[in-house]
Amino acid sequence: MLEDEEGLLLPGGKSLHAQNEKELRDVQLQNGYVRTYAKNKYYTGEKLETKIWVGDYTDNGTTDIYAKQSTGINRIAVLRADVDDLGQTFVAGFEKSKKTLSRMATLSRQMSLFFKFHINQILNQGSSSLLSEAGPRKVTIVYSGGDDLFLVGAWNEVIACAIDIHKALEQYAIGALHISAGIGVFPAKYPLSVCAREVEELEQKAKDY
């Protein structure tokens, strides 16, 4: 953020600029520099005040590309998932003497951090399985935040992602939280909005299982 009128205009005579690390170092020396907003970076220091976590992993594929990259049949898969009984965890997950606002706020922040930050690393460093080799997954996150996840990719890669995420959350929460997911396999041209609705029903069936 700078005090000028050359970027995206903000109230108070300030503007927002998108810059790489080298450009940022130069800008920080200017008199009009106000602060930095960093996306998925652990920048710290004076006027480095706001960290923005975004679950935005993608290998820049399209549905057509994902279908061609899949193993066997040329299909994509859509996954929708969320954490089981998270509301109940907030209500009854703490001992009475330890049920404080600060602990509940910390739990909320840590869940958000998993789905907005750690999820990118999980998908970028996928584990080897029968369905996929180790390495970056051939998927794209459509939405990830709170305790919800929606992604699309090559069908075998999406299933491998589900396994990776399940294991990662189990380790992250020391086995205290579990996640349910619905996965649907579709032709590449099938409307994504319809995929989302159909997979939402599968997700609910998984929760009821």
Language model: regions and residue ranges:
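Regulatory/sensor and coupling segments of signal-transduction and defense proteins
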Residues: 1-209
